[in-house]
């Protein structure tokens, strides 16, 4: 028989054998029985008022045809062979990698990713002396990793913070130095590079540093550098690379950073195949996938050594706001104690409104701050210091630290030492800089053993505080989460002042990955028998969220690869490699390729299931199925009319019977108690009608009412007595409104009063065996909208078709209908899986690459045959800001008439990235150039939009922030740091960070000017560097 699933819906109207003549109109006229979507399976209650015969006659036929579904519900009958053929062509796409497990001791897993055509050769034990001896016994994972390095094979070491990953890196350095090879150690941030340089230098001496800010001994055998520097060395074909045998990537999990992660990916792709790697990472669940990518990319084995082992086990406590004690929720064996968790949440509930923060998750009442004080005091009394207190904003950090002024944790002897270290550190500052408020305010705190660490601090103070903390002279350190990155400074206790953070878009619970990274600072190896983590919670949290947060897994390493113009231009400039290659080889693309076999499997299984389902008289059943689907769709449209507040609110009086149904839960009938407008709807949130919340008395499962808010209530199971509870429900979740109203008791607090309402509801249902009567949208609710009338006409016509269909009264209807539904769902699954396949097979971002090349051609950076032009060569020199806009400005002569101070101030817009509430009032000498720059940016946005690149002009323009223009200008004219700090509300540390980035950009601008031979411009930028590079802004790092 032909396959019915290719039929369009209109075929419904072509079987005239059971035409309107045989219409069953003996259905009695009765009250509105609800929108057609609410029909039971056999369509028993779809009998709305049937109008005259013409409802299904000529006038409506065209209407109904138009309503037909856009595509066949079922495609052609799928054939298994098709997907097998697809499979064959996939073989070429799939990365040729296999993974072998290696036997190892407990508490550590060892796998190796190999090219598919290579056999695994077990690692050979070391012959002769080790490249480096250690004074302590190595852990299993360290021994395994060192064996890989001894065998000259790449390895990814994934372990918790402070588990001792650095040992593996040091060994690779020692081996390279012994073999007279060069080795590069890269780290994500300059501050971390400085610290690593210090450590490595003390260990090996033959060590250099390159961070962009500072270059020390660049001919050394071991070079510590930021990933950005390594990337530019690779693009420039630096000689150094020829001698490199090992590259060590520290904190490789940084690769998921949305802004800078792409630099790691570029660098790893550009590195030659003969180099070996050591990757150090926090715990990542998909470490094996990363190793497979490295193997696929560089045609060499890559080992994964993974351990969850913590040398010091952790205990996790919750401190509920308003309570006065700690609750152990995860013990040192990693077991989640649900009863303790629920007790803590109960304390929070009892503390009531006092502990309630406002909607944004900030502290409320007066208890907030004193809680931190209470806990810190308790930590000191129990001798659990040193403690790191994590807050999610710089302001909170400082506010909490200042509350500690009454406490003193240091002895007189320690105070003297703090003062000595502090004075030595700031010795390099000028007398004037020593008097800066930040410098003067922090010393009294430090002497009492209290420190602050966030991005707004002067770098020199930040480093002083790190040194004091590592020497045990700071007992309580108030820090933002940046302190959890990289630098190995463990404490005994970690305290979170909040479980929610603002991530630039909204307030949310912190992720389990963030929690793992920060809480990993607790517990010092060899000093503490266990680490303590305390989480302050001031908002109710369900056990699910709690468990997910405290016991969840680390965040996977997902690629954040995206194209940049600098990347595209550099790849066009380099002979051997093109941008398409970079896209194909990216981890981003690899992760999508890895999904292919799973999708193919899914298609295969679905098609087998599809072919197994045999429906007798299939064509007929499908016609009937489509009619019912269409009725359900129209039913939804009617519901939308009924839900409009102007129509339904007058009927939601107390006592009205309503049916409540949300996505997964059907509560059945309940009784309206009250309704109110939802207050916190944002005016621009795109919600046209204000949201109304109806309080409905519903039968809920007792379990769901136990430990969470009533919003999370679930319906009682059929066999459960349940409990009547008032639940807030949004209007659109009311699936039906009845004509019936019941009397409800005035006081609904006593359980008996609420349960009495349930008896009344059951009585109503007994009285109306055919279903509780519903409000008719036209007759009862008085909706006069023409649109609704049209929908009802269509419903009547479709119902007519349904009642007159031979299947409608068939005793087997239920069975065949369920089969048909199942088959339709499988057909949809197959369709979406095939779409997924198609997507996975195309190289991602290829369209964007085409658009970007189009922009480069139109702006004259490259020719139509992808040959780079002069403009493009200039743009290649600029990597730390918007290379397109800066090159355009240069070629348009925008900098020619500016003084070096003006040019420097204008460039600050490109490197300042923070938010400042104050917009400076700029003088014309700064506002003029800013306007010209914005005009130039508008032109680029316009060209980009014409080249079909998704770009929002306003967002693009607002990414250049002029907030520090006047500050930089004043600094460049010779003002003191104290003076410029008073000009803005931006933190001192942020000003310095902006200046240092600015100096880096000025150096790149010098190179760019040199590339076009414009000496005057080159000198102007060089003069800018001289003017800003002075005093505290460029005070050398204490680690160097």
From Swiss-Prot:
A molecular function GO annotation: ATP hydrolysis activity
Subcellular location: Nucleus, Nucleoplasm; Nucleus, Nucleolus; Nucleus; Nucleus speckle
Modified-residue entries (Phosphoserine), positions: 38
Residue sites binding ATP per the record: 137, 159-166
Gene3D superfamilies named among the record's database cross-references: 1.10.3380.30, 2.40.30.300, P-loop containing nucleotide triphosphate hydrolases
UniProt modified residues of type N-acetylalanine: 2
Main enzyme class: hydrolase
Record keywords: Acetylation, ATP-binding, DNA damage, Helicase, Hydrolase, Isopeptide bond, mRNA processing, mRNA splicing, Nucleotide-binding, Nucleus, Phosphoprotein, rRNA processing, Spliceosome, Ubl conjugation
Biased composition (Basic and acidic residues): 23-33, 41-50
Name of the protein: Exosome RNA helicase MTR4
Residues that bear N6-acetyllysine: 49, 76
Residue ranges constituting the Helicase ATP-binding domain according to the UniProt record: 146-302
Family as reported in the entry's similarity comment: Belongs to the helicase family. SKI2 subfamily.
Position of the Glycyl lysine isopeptide (Lys-Gly) (interchain with G-Cter in SUMO2) cross-link: 24, 356, 682, 721
Its EC number(s): 3.6.4.13
Pfam families the UniProt entry points to: DEAD, DSHCT, Helicase_C, MTR4-like_stalk, MTR4_beta-barrel
Residue ranges of every copy of the Helicase C-terminal domain listed in the record: 403-575
GO terms under cellular component: catalytic step 2 spliceosome; nuclear exosome (RNase complex); nuclear speck; nucleolus; nucleoplasm; nucleus; TRAMP complex
Principal location: nucleus
Top-level lineage group: Eukaryota
PROSITE patterns (alphabetical): HELICASE_ATP_BIND_1, HELICASE_CTER
Regulation: Activated when MTREX is incorporated into NEXT complex an the nuclear RNA exosome complex.
Stretches the record annotates as Disordered: 16-77
